[in-house]
Amino acid sequence: MDVTRTRSLRLAAAGVAAALSIAALAACSPGPAGAGDAKTDAGVLTVAASAAVTTWDPVASFSTEALYMGNIYEPLLWKNAEGSSQEFTPAIAKSWTTSDDGLTWTFDIRKGVTFHDGEKLDADAVVKSIQAAQERAGASFIWTPLESIEATDDATVVMHLKYSAPMDLVAASTYGAWIVSPKALAASASDDKYFEKGVDAGTGPYTLDSYDPGSKVVLKAYDDYWNEDEAPTYGIVDISITPDAVTAQQMLTAKEVDFATTVPLENIDDVAAQMDGKVRTANSPFNYVGYFNTLRPPLDDPKVRQALSYAVPYQDLIDVGVQGYGTQAHGPVPKGIFPYSEDVPQYSYDLDKAEALLAGAGHPDGFTLKLTYASENPAEARFVPLIKDSFAKIGVNVEVTAELFNQQWEKAKSDPANAQDIFIVYYWPTYSDAGSDNLNSLFHSSEKPFFNLSYWKNADYDALIDKAGTLTGSDRSAAQADYVKAMGMLYDQAPGLYLFDAQAVTVVPNALKIAPFNENYPFTTFFAPIEPAA
């Protein structure tokens, strides 16, 4: 398994995903099984959606086509949004248990479910799907803890792990965890273009009815969907692929579509008023961090890094960068995602304290730093000048360079000694465990820099998050406590600036009822729960 390659694919898409930081997200959660009334066909739901399709292969999928995948395919279980009464909702698995040591996970597979191609769902189909994900998924690395998997009977799947890990979170991932018809998996193994013909092989509430590349996706309600109580209200979802948020806004306000997944944030209140709707905000998994180059003076001194952390006007960055739709970060773990904690301290905006720390570190006259950000991220383009201006007030000159993300990233990895001093990054976890992802990927020591672009190495921090990672599957509260300690170290040592968590913002037209946004599936708009308001 090439972890570097698969994770780099996700980061390489950061420029595309950056549009989310300036657009209104319109996504909602899948409903809990059995929670709704039987539904009737409301006809056609028309949608303007920004998400492009890079592949229809549910195993390889690792990009914005997740918007559609979550309607066609299902995982073993769904991770519910923060604040839900239950952490998970059963999907393909009716129930699951784990051994006390967290090394064995047993899933009870739902009976009476069929794939869209007519194949029957059973435990063997689940095993084949997960084995395919291990071998070739874009997010194959999420299955790294899995030693072996077996179907002990038609309705039971047992996972044996190399080390304790949170397989409930892994099994609920938005990437690399879809359960796929074994017939389609076999066909795609001999024909890598099999799914690109418009084939789908999921168990979800919708089937892929048609696809016009770059233009239109049409989904059709699946007549034999297993969950009758949560069957779609709309028999057809007609989606116009509309990458430009302004165009989507125009289509929505002109009533050419019922719903738009992206609207420019600066226009969101006006759009809601025109639609006689409302603006709804929620957590999202998107987080902004500014790496310090801890290998090069003066940023090799924690006191200097702390001083600069006090010189960031955090609320101004939120107000200007994302129109106020964000919250100051408590470290690099976004709000609503494990192991987020408000017990993790934050730096305040305090120029007097910043100046005093700089003087105490031997830099009363300041110095010059080089800062880079992704040119394709308009939110960064808006808020980076505020950092430059504020640092100037304490005598620190910042030379700003905008580069395509991949260019910025390659330079940062290749020669840390001559790289940037500050690297702004827009990041989100692959699945709902920011301990194994954000805290590990962004700040764990590595022989060669890949994600840890602060180049920071701290053996105590490494040991703490390594330990926490082995506890998450068996004792999540203990893991949480260790992760919070680790984030306290990040605050004290300040290898990065922990800027803000972006919020998800939804325009809810008055003609529709839309379920709340789920931060665990940020790229997916779940269409089945959408209903006419009247």
Task: Report each predicted region and the residues it spans.
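N-terminal lobe/hinge region of extracytoplasmic solute-binding protein
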Residues: A48-D100, Q131, A201-G202
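A bilobed periplasmic-binding-protein/Venus flytrap-type ligand-binding module shared by bacterial periplasmic
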Residues: K79-N80, K220-D224, S284-A307, A311, ...
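Gly/Pro-rich hinge or "lid" segments in bacterial periplasmic/extracellular proteins
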Residues: A81-G83, T174-D229
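Aromatic- and charge-enriched surface segment that lines or borders ligand/interaction sites
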Residues: K94-A137, T152, V158-Y163, P298
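Surface-exposed binding/hinge segments that line
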Residues: D108, F141-A186, S210-D212
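Detector for C-terminal structural segments
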Residues: D212-K216, V312-F338, A379-L386, K413-A534
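Ligand-site clamp/hinge motif
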Residues: D223-D270
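Append "and occasionally in soluble cytosolic enzymes with long acidic Gly/Pro-rich linkers
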Residues: D300-D389, I394, K457, P532-A533
